[in-house]
A protein has these predicted regions:
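Rossmann-like nucleotide/phosphate-binding core characteristic of flavoprotein oxidoreductases
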Residues: 11, 20-22, 28-30, 81
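Glycine- and other small-residue-rich loops at beta-strand/loop junctions that grip anionic moieties
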Residues: 20, 41-42, 66
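Ferredoxin-like iron-sulfur electron-transfer modules
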Residues: 25-37, 60-61, 65-68, 89-116, ...
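Cys/His-coordinated zinc-binding microdomains
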Residues: 41-44, 53-56, 118-121, 125-128, ...
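Short coil/turn segments at secondary-structure boundaries
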Residues: 42-47, 90-91
């Protein structure tokens, strides 16, 4: 089994990657490696890039739906599948002339307007936002994936987006591996919270809701 699939977070158990043959696992891992790991859900898979990669291979889902990856990622996946290139799902962000992908973005919180509600913290798939109740929150720009999942959670609209220089191609694999690891760490942390019977808290995120559903099934 590819190393990426060793001891995956519980949320991914339903993918049943461990019962697939090695060739299938390898293809899923290769497609997942091509995806930008923003975990944005714009492909239709709210639980991240790996479920999308799995759906492409096992269920024949369209391989051109990664919005932040743009045409380069759509073409890379087409090559892995030995299929023709398809136009990438369009992005609202302009195409960067250097990377040929949609412009990379990051989020920033306007501190003077933040009310410290903590809702954006639970929405972040890579734990890039820190803060406590009634205190100003901060986003670590180097960790932010630009997924925009924090925006709709903010009751006072104090989160802005701004473009950044594209990640150099040589640095992209390491960046994506780091984002994947952070997302998996986030899932495991939420899993521990869900399983903490003594300090049970209300469900506050999509991930927690899905984990609760998994426990019931």
């Amino acid at each position: 089994m590819p190393v990426e699939f060793d001891r995956l977070p519980v949320l991914f158990a339903r993918l049943q990657l461990n019962v697939q043959d090695i060739a299938t696992q390898t293809q899923i891992a290769a497609i997942d490696a091509a995806l930008p790991q923003t975990q944005c859900g714009l492909c239709g898979h709210a639980d991240g890039c790996l479920p999308y990669a799995t759906a492409i291979v096992l269920h024949g889902e369209p391989y051109n739906q990664c919005v932040p990856g743009g045409q380069p990622v759509a073409d890379a996946i087409a090559a892995l599948l030995n299929k023709p290139n398809l136009p990438a799902k369009p992005s609202k962000w302009a195409t960067d002339p250097v990377s040929d992908r949609p412009s990379e973005i990051r989020a920033i919180i306007r501190g003077d307007d933040c009310i410290g509600c903590t809702k954006c913290i639970t929405a972040c798939p890579v734990d890039a936002i820190i803060g406590s109740g009634k205190q100003m929150h901060t986003i670590f720009a180097d960790w932010c994936t630009g997924c925009e999942l924090c925006l709709p959670t903010c009751p006072v609209d104090c989160i802005d987006l701004y473009p950044v220089a594209p990640t150099p191609a040589a640095e992209r694999p390491a960046q994506q591996a780091d984002l994947r690891a952070r997302y998996h760490a986030h899932l495991r942390r939420v899993e521990r919270q869900v399983n903490d019977q003594q300090n049970a808290q209300p469900v506050v995120s999509m991930v927690q809701a899905k984990l609760n559903d998994s426990k019931v099934q």
